[in-house]
């Protein structure tokens, strides 16, 4: 029997969740369809964690009052701030998007990531 209050995040070959389209008002390029598996969500939605994936695409990304921890399971991303500065990450790397970020997320290839998103108000 598994330990109480312990929930594994299973990285299966194919996420068994429906495609979620990226809203047209933030989509920059690509089709923007994503899949997400959320095994944990706080009752007040202040913390969410799981697995997210997409094909190559780019979108506007804004984190005014939340942080996101990301660990790339597969793929390459480029994240650019509003001033045009950017950081690139590849499979096996982790990073944090801090509160106040405003810029562009680009999945340069197929991307799959573990993530934790937390409100910071």
Segments (PLM) and residue ranges:
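Ligand-binding loop in jelly-roll beta-barrel domains
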Residues: 99-121
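Residue-level recognition of conserved beta-strand positions in structured domain cores
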Residues: 51, 64, 81, 107, ...
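Conserved short histidine dyad/triad with adjacent acidic residue
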Residues: 46-64, 98-99
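Well-ordered beta-strand positions in beta-sheet-rich domains
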Residues: 51, 86-88, 102-104
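A short, N-terminal "cap"/entry segment at the start of jelly-roll beta-barrel domains
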Residues: 1-46
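Short, conserved beta-strand element in jelly-roll/cupin
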Residues: 64-79
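Short acidic-glycine-tyrosine-enriched beta hairpin
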Residues: 83-99
């Amino acid at each position: 029997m598994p330990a109480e209050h312990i929930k594994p995040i299973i990285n299966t070959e194919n996420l068994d969740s429906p495609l979620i389209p990226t809203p047209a008002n933030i989509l920059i390029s690509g089709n923007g369809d994503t899949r997400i598996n959320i095994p944990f969500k706080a009752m007040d939605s202040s913390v969410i964690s799981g697995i997210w994936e997409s094909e190559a695409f780019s979108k506007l990304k804004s984190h005014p009052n939340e942080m996101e921890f990301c660990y790339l399971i597969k793929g390459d991303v480029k994240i650019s701030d509003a001033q045009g500065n950017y950081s690139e990450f590849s499979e096996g790397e982790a990073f944090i998007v801090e509160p106040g970020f405003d810029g562009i997320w680009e999945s340069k290839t197929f991307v799959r990531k573990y993530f934790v998103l937390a409100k910071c108000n």
